[in-house]
Amino acid sequence: MTVKTETAAGASTLTYSKMRGMVALLIAFMKQRRMGLNEFIQKIATNSSYSCKPSEVQSILNISPPQESELLNENSSPPPSHSQQINLGPSSNPHAKPSDFQFLKIIGKGSFGKVLLARHKADEKFYAVKVLQKKAILKKKEEKHIMSERNVLLKNVKHPFLVGLHFSIQTTSRLYFILDYINGGELFYHLQRERCFLEPRARFYAAEIASALGYLHSLNIVYRDLKPENILLDSQGHIVLTDFGLCKENIEPNGITSTFCGTPEYLAPEVLHKQPYDRTVDWWCLGAVLYEMLYGLPPFYSRNTAEMYDNILNKPLQLKPNITNSARNLLEGLLQKDRTKRTGAKTDFMEIKNHIFFSPIDWDDLINKKITPPFNPNVSGPSDLQHFDPEFTDEPVPNSIGQSPDSILITASIKEAAEAFMGFSYAPPMDSYL
C-alpha cells in the first residue's frame, strides 16, 4: 500500500512502513507529553510558592514536537515492539472524570462516604462508584489504608471472586473508586432474611471465599476483615469479595504483622491478645463466617463486646449436632485458638482446599464458574435494586458528586490532600482503548 503526498520538492511516495513509523513517533510524543503534563500539574498542586514562568514550561514538560523530516525519513526506525513500548503504569490516564458518569442511586454508605450506582455516559455501562471525602480520611489519618485499598484492587483483575477496579479518580475534595457493579445483595442481607443456610449452600460460598483468600495470600496480601457485610452475591449467585481497606500488603508466607484491626465478632484470639499474627487470621475469619452461615450467629457472639472478647479468648467452641462430621472437623480446625495449630497454618489455601468438607467441590469448575450456584438472586438487570436497603436507595443523590471542577484554587488543605493521595488516579493503559 502506498500514499501520494505533495511537498515543495515535488511528489513523494509514503509507504505503509513509513506511515507506521509516523504513528509510532506520534504515540511516543503524546505519551511523553502526558507524563510531562502530569509532573507539571503535581509540581504546581504541591508547591504554592512555585511560579510558572513561560521559559520553564518547555523544560518541565520535557518535550519537543517531532519534525516533518523525522516523520518522513526514508530510514525511520520501525515502530517499537509491544515489549519496547513505554509502560506508563497505573497512573493518571485522563480517560475518566466524575462528569463522565450519571449517578443514579445511593446503594451503600461507609465511614468516609457513599457507594453509588452510576452509568457511564459514553458506553452506558453500569458501575458501583465508591465516593470518599478526602477531608474525613485525613481527619482520621486513614490515607494509608485508602491507598492500600487502591493498590490491592489493582491486583484483583485476575480473580473471579474479587471485585474489580476500572478507574480510580480524584477531585480536590473527593476520591472515586469505579468498581464492578454487583447487585445480588450482601451475604449479610441474605443471612438476615433466611437466618442460616443448608450445608451444601454454605459449602459453596465457603469454597469461593477460600479461593479468593488463597489468591490474595498468593500475592502476599492478608485480607483481615472477612465478614458477611463484605461478601456480595453477583447476579448469578457467585460470591464477590469487596472492601479492601484493612488489607495488609507484603506479608510473606511466614511473615507477621501486629496492627489491631477488624470487626469484633470475627477477630482472632491472637489479634485480641495484641500479639503478632499472620495470614491464618483470614482462616479464623472463614471459620467464623462458615459457622454463622450454618448456625445464624458468629461463633462466640454476645451483645456485650467485652464478654464476646472473653468468649473468643477463653470459651471452648460449642457445636450443635445438626451438621456433618466433616463440617464439624473443619470448624474445629479453622476456629483453633492456637494459630500454629489452625487449619491453614501449614500449607495455607491448599490445606483448606484438600479438607474432606470440600470433597464434593471440583475446584477447577469452581474457579471457572461452571458450578451452578445454589441460590439465584433473580435480578432483572442493573436497575433492579431489590437487594439494596431502601434507606440508601431512597436518599437523593447530591448533584456535586458528578461534577468535575474546571478550575482549582490551591489552598493549604488541597495541597495537603494532593500530597496524601498522590498517585491515586488510575485508568487502564491507553492501548486498551485503541
Curated annotation (Swiss-Prot):
GO molecular function, one term: protein serine kinase activity
Residue span, AGC-kinase C-terminal domain: 359-434
Active site: 225 (proton acceptor)
Keywords from the named record: Apoptosis, ATP-binding, Cytoplasm, Endoplasmic reticulum, Kinase, Nucleotide-binding, Nucleus, Phosphoprotein, Serine/threonine-protein kinase, Stress response, Transferase
GO terms classed as biological process: apoptotic process
Transmembrane segments: none
Main location per the UniProt record: cytoplasm
Family annotation (SUPFAM superfamilies): Protein kinase-like (PK-like)
Keyword Lyase assigned: no
EC numbers, comma separated: 2.7.11.1
Family named by the database record: Belongs to the protein kinase superfamily. AGC Ser/Thr protein kinase family.
Function: Protein kinase that may play an important role in cellular stress response. Plays an important role in activating certain potassium, sodium, and chloride channels, suggesting an involvement in the regulation of processes such as cell survival, neuronal excitability and renal sodium excretion.
Protein name: Serine/threonine-protein kinase Sgk1-B
Organism: Xenopus laevis (African clawed frog)
